[in-house]
């Protein structure tokens, strides 16, 4: 199963649209906030979006959002903790978001906010930031038939 992960578009709707169109084989699309209007525009404009699972949370630059700040989702055999990361101060430390994952028995944490691609596996918890769509960056997570995860960062040409 292919998961497309994006964050921090900040008005760069066309970059988001390109990323989504380049990854039409993704079964699930996840948006980590800071660009809710970009997300809404793409979800409305791109044919076939309703056929895919969609998960979105708000970021600190999404005022008056109706999106949740955090989402706990099971995808395959994995338990995902999905958030923008601003409330966990991820620009300073990942300790808080890691402890939240442990407390909520999550094995995958997806966050944005820093605009920097990041991946680390620590004591069985995968921490993944796709980077910022505004900089042409996004991530892909693949879950194979055995449930094994792979995490990749990409950048638009």
Regions inferred by a protein language model and the residue ranges of each:
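N-terminal active-site segment of His-dependent metallophosphoesterases
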Residues: 1-49, 62-66, 146-148, 154
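Core dinuclear metal-dependent hydrolase active-site scaffold
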Residues: 3-5, 74, 80-82, 138-141, ...
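Active-site neighborhood of phospho(di)ester-bond hydrolases with catalytic His/Asp-centered motifs
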Residues: 5-7, 29-34, 55-60, 81-84, ...
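Active-site environment of divalent metal-dependent phosphoester hydrolases
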Residues: 10-14, 36-40, 61-66, 88-93, ...
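Short secondary-structure boundary/capping segments
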Residues: 46, 70-74, 101, 117-119
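Helix-adjacent hinge/juxtasegments
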Residues: 51-90
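Charged helix-capping and loop-helix junction motifs
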Residues: 92-100
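Binuclear metal-dependent phosphoesterase catalytic core
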Residues: 99, 103-105, 121-157
């Amino acid at each position: 199963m292919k998961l497309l992960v994006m964050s921090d578009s900040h008005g760069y709707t066309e970059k988001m649209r390109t990323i989504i169109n380049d990854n039409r084989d993704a079964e699930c699309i996840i948006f980590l906030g800071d660009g809710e209007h970009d997300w809404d525009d793409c979800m409305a404009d791109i044919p076939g979006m309703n056929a895919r699972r969609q998960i979105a949370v708000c970021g600190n630059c999404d005022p008056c959002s109706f999106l949740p700040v955090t989402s706990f989702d099971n995808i395959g055999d994995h338990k995902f903790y999905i958030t923008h990361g601003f409330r966990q101060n991820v620009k300073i430390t990942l300790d808080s978001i890691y402890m939240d994952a442990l407390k909520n028995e999550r094995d995958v944490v997806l966050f944005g906010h820093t605009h920097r691609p990041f991946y680390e596996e620590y004591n069985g918890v995968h921490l993944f930031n796709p980077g910022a769509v505004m900089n042409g960056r996004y991530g892909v997570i693949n879950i194979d038939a055995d449930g094994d995860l792979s995490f990749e960062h990409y950048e638009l040409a």
